Structures are given as C-alpha cells and as structure tokens.
Swiss-Prot record:
It is a multi-pass membrane protein. One of its GO terms (biological process) is heme O biosynthetic process. The gene is ctaB1. Converts heme B (protoheme IX) to heme O by substitution of the vinyl group on carbon 2 of heme B porphyrin ring with a hydroxyethyl farnesyl side group. It is found in: Cell membrane. The chain crosses the membrane at residues 22-42, 53-73, 94-114, 115-135, 154-174, 179-199, 230-250, 283-303. Interacts with CtaA. Its EC number is 2.5.1.141. This is Protoheme IX farnesyltransferase 1. One of its GO terms (cellular component) is plasma membrane. It is an enzyme of class 2 (transferase). Carbon 2 of the heme B porphyrin ring is defined according to the Fischer nomenclature. It catalyses: heme b + (2E,6E)-farnesyl diphosphate + H2O = Fe(II)-heme o + diphosphate.
Length: 305
C-alpha cells in the first residue's frame, strides 16, 4: 500500500514537473497574440476559418512546442542563477526533478516537431518560429541576459514573434503595416513590463548578478526609459490604422493611459507601488488589445460584408 501511494504521488508530480520545465504559463500567454495575428490575417484576406482548420491546428501545436522548447532550453541554461532567485529556485532543473540531459532532449524534440508542424502551415511560419527560438536561446539566454542592461531589448524580439507566426501560418507575407505594427507593439510592450518586474524583484536580480536596468541604473533612469518606450508605443499604434481605425484607437487609448499612469504613479507612489501598478496595467493592456484584435477580426470574418 505504501509503495503504491508513493508511485501515485510521483505520477501526479510528473505533469507539474513537465509544465514547469516548458513553462506552460508562458506558452498560454503567447498563444493569445499568436491567435490574434492568425485571425487578423484571416480577416485581412477574407478567408473563412473553416477553410484553414488544419493550418490553425498546426499553428497552435507548432507554437506550443516551439515556445515549450524555448522554456526547456532556458531552464537548462539558467539553472545556476535560478537557484539563487526566490521565484525560480523551485524549478525542476534546479531541484533535480528533471536532469539536464532530459531537459536538453526535451527541448530538442520539441524544437524538431514544433518546426515540422509550423512548416505544415507555411515555410515562413516555420522560419519565424526558428528565428524566435534561436534569438531567445542564444543572444538572450546565453549572452545578453547576464552581460548587459539591454538584455530585455534583445530578448524582446523573440518574445514578439507569436503574432507574426500566426499571420504567416495563414498568409506567407508579413509585410502588411498592421502585422508589423502588432509585432513592434509587442516588442515595445515588454520593456515597461519587465522593468516593472525587475524593480519589484530588485534584490533577487542583484543577488544573481543579472544586470537588469533598474538594478544597474536605478529607478529614475528606468522611469525615463519606460516613458520613452510608452511614447514609442503610442506612435506605433498608428500602424494598426492601415487595417482598422477602431483597432488603432483602442491601442492608442491603452498606450496613452499607460503613459499617464507611469507619470502620475511615479510622482504619487513609492517605487514598489509604482512598479506594481505598471505591471498590472501591462497585463491589462495586452489582454484588452489582443482580445480586441481577435474579436474584431472574427466579427469581420463572419458578419462583415
């Protein structure tokens, strides 16, 4: 009885170990912008989703595998600094619940199958998936994260790939201003978002010797740089107007509110509360923007003229 109970407990833990290794939370959050890019392409080119059911399924499966592979590789490489930081010290690669060799092979297999599934949509989607994975693992995880205050900027390009992949899975041309705008918005969005996290986790990053901007340059420099990026975010929102004035206005409003919150909060709150308010609004911003893109696109597909 005792041995059976131990086995059952171990089996219950396996899904959790796998989920933490491939970072299922990040996978879920990235599937939303991927689907936004996908539905926007369907809307732009007046394609019924029912005509593209295989491509839609393959895009989801391929994206899940590629993003999961990135998580596995990141956990594998970062296990030394993850062991120092409170929020990452219980990751399976740190605790030994999964061996480095297993994490490596998991990442390799997920990469191969992820690229295959994306290639079943279009070759461009697979190429973009590979570029995103490579940029996240090599320039970001293996180099810039530990060496420069611009690590967030370098990592942001890979983090902005999902909408491009979604669009490319439907139509193999990502030069339309609307999808370029969505891509750049996702790049810029990451700086205020991750700066806010770094302020709140300042001591952990400092202990792990990770040169995040707030750790190295302080809160005032971070405040200035955050506002610069938010102004850029406002300007880039105009690109969405090439496809929809409504989407452009939603993006403009959200970005202006974010900038106003940053300026007001910095003057009225301590740095911890200011960072928390920016972090919460960053989640609100991205959720509302991409949900609006998806709803607008689907309504246009099914009810548009």
């Amino acid at each position: 009885m005792g041995r059976k109970k131990e086995v059952t407990n171990a089996q219950r833990q396996r899904p959790e170990i796998l989920a933490q290794t491939i970072k299922t939370g990040i996978i879920k959050s990235n599937l939303v912008p991927m689907f936004a890019g996908l539905t926007l392409a369907l809307y732009k080119y007046k394609i019924s989703p029912f005509e593209k059911i295989p491509e839609i399924l393959f895009a989801f499966i391929g994206s899940i595998l590629i993003i999961g592979a990135a998580g596995a590789f990141n956990n594998l490489y970062d296990r030394d600094i993850d062991s120092i930081m409170e929020r990452t010290k219980n990751r399976p690669t740190v605790t030994g619940d999964i061996s480095p060799k297993t994490a490596l092979w998991l990442g390799i297999f997920m990469t191969i199958f992820g690229l295959v599934f994306l290639a079943l949509t279009t070759y461009l989607a697979a190429i973009l998936g590979f570029i995103g994975l490579f940029l996240y693992v090599v320039p970001y995880t293996m180099w810039s994260k530990r060496r420069t205050i611009y690590n967030t900027e370098i990592g942001s390009v890979s983090g902005a790939m999902p909408p491009l992949i979604g669009w490319a899975a439907i139509y193999p041309d990502v030069t339309h201003p609307a999808i370029i705008g969505l891509f750049i918005i996702m790049i810029i969005w990451q700086m205020p978002h991750f700066y806010a996290i770094a302020i709140r986790k300042h001591k952990e990053y400092e202990a792990a010797n990770v040169p995040m901007l707030p750790v190295v340059k302080g809160v005032k420099r971070t405040y200035i740089q955050t506002n610069v990026y938010l102004v850029i975010l406002i300007i880039i929102s105009i690109l969405l107007g090439s496809l929809s004035i409504g989407l452009m206005l939603v993006s403009l409003l959200l970005s202006i509110l974010w900038l106003a919150l940053s300026i007001y909060g910095y003057k009225k709150m301590d740095s911890e509360k200011w960072a928390k308010s920016l972090f919460i609004f960053s989640l609100f911003h991205m959720t509302i923007l991409f949900s609006t893109v998806i709803i607008y696109s689907l309504v246009g597909i099914f009810f548009g003229s």
